[in-house]
Amino acid sequence: MNKVPKLQIANVITNSKKYPYLIVFSIAIFLRLVSEILAFPYPIGYDVINYYLPVIKNFEEYWPTISNQFPFYVSLLYAISEVFHVEPRSVISASIVLVFGFFSLAIFSIGRNLLRLDNLRSIFLSIFVIFQLAVLRTSWDLYKDMFALTLTFFSLLFISKIPKISKKLIAVTATLSIVSVLADRMIGLLLSISLIGSSFVKRDRDLAIVVGIVIVIFGLLLQANHDNIGYNPKMVGSNNSINEIYNPINLIVLFLVMNAILLPSGIVGFIRSKLIIFKIPLLISAIGSFTWIIFPNTSAFLPDRWIVIFSIFLSLFSGYGFITLIENRRIALSCRKLNNYLIILIPFIFLGSAFAASPNNSYLNIYGAFHQFIGPYGPLTMQYNSISLPESKSLLSAIDWINNDTNTAEGSVIMGSKHLRGWMELELKERTFLFADNNTKLLASNKYGELYLLELISRQSTEIPENYLQELAYNSTDFSLYRLKLIK
């Protein structure tokens, strides 16, 4: 009796044109929304607290700085917040949840329209991709990247159908491509090179026009942002650009954590699929992932970001590789294909869910075992901003105490970690927050006769010089505030 309803449900999903899209979209929305709800009332994402919230709340003040940093996405969020009178935090969170949902639709559409998969297998592909660490990590705080990647996937999907699509859809494709290059420099570069490569393969007039328009616009953007962009290549030749974080061991471990489990099936999917237009960005991002071999110990080419982007494209081929292996009975742990799909999918769902929803110190998150190596490139879980959520609560209490304490009067200088700058800008009242890459050196300069030092107890990093008198003014579970006075 139970087989009939199951069969009917399977038939509805297999034959329906709208329900599969709704299923995939709903799963993606639920996954990304849960991570926001679990963290409430605190935001998640390093750039959310240190970039998006401060910039949107003080947009005019920040505009001279961000105007040459590909500001399309943050400007869009600001416009939505102003036009609809919605609090910036809500706009930021809602936007990434929706973008994540549309990203899942892009993956499903690729499965249906390019890989010629049926609805059930396209659903498998979509779920497989959205639960990957690289995708979730990007949605954690790299919102511009996630937005631009989603548009890029749709653009490449439509371009692969040229010349079989209408002029209107070609115009839509051009628009999506333009917005993508406006949104993010790295993804814009990736899309531009992919478009050039696809134009050589297809040799279509309409595609050539689209490519020409996109390349011209992206070139103008690069020219307009020349000073900001030119800084990266200059770092390569500088002896001062050595960055211990970007050492080969760390980057190799990051690459393996992101991609090792995906590579075997990814190679199968790469060989078996005809997704030439998606193979181009995969290969480009692979090259970017290993720029550290030629230019070691420098962040100039952002190899960690390229590793994440490579993993996102690899997950598409890896998912298709698993489908191919299951359909060809190369993976046959069960006599039923559906069970084999579930056997593959469930571990990835577990790993992705643990990363999205578990506390920062949870034993469920196996990535914590590699924290020593990959910690500088991202969080152990998504339940984190620039500090952990419990530390966020404690920090707000400390800031409230500072704002209301008579000793830390208005005009006082508060020194602290650069990771706290967003919190301080948003919450600290009538006081100056001071931070630097090295606060110890800043104190040693003796520029400040009297100030306060706010330290995170779990990782105190500032050494107080001997020529400063220090007095503990405030202490909590996570933070200590010291009053410092220079001895003359």
Model-derived regions: residue spans:
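Terminal disorder- and signal-encoded targeting elements
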Residues: 1, 345-350, 382, 434, ...
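Membrane-embedded transmembrane-helix bundle of lipid-linked glycan/lipid transferases
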Residues: 1-371, 377, 416, 470-473, ...
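Extracytoplasmic/secreted cell-surface and envelope-processing proteins
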Residues: 138-140, 190, 423-425, 461-465
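Generic structural signal for beta-strand residues in well-ordered domains
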Residues: 172, 406-407, 445-446
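Generic recognition of flexible, low-complexity loop/linker segments
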Residues: 177, 296, 400-401, 441-442
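A short, acidic, amphipathic alpha-helical segment used as a generic capping/interface helix at domain edges
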Residues: 185, 439-444
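Short periplasmic/luminal acceptor-recognition loop of GT-C membrane glycosyltransferases, typified by
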Residues: 351-440, 449-456, 482-483
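Aromatic/acidic, Gly/Pro-rich catalytic loop(s) in extracytoplasmic/lumenal soluble domains
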Residues: 443-488
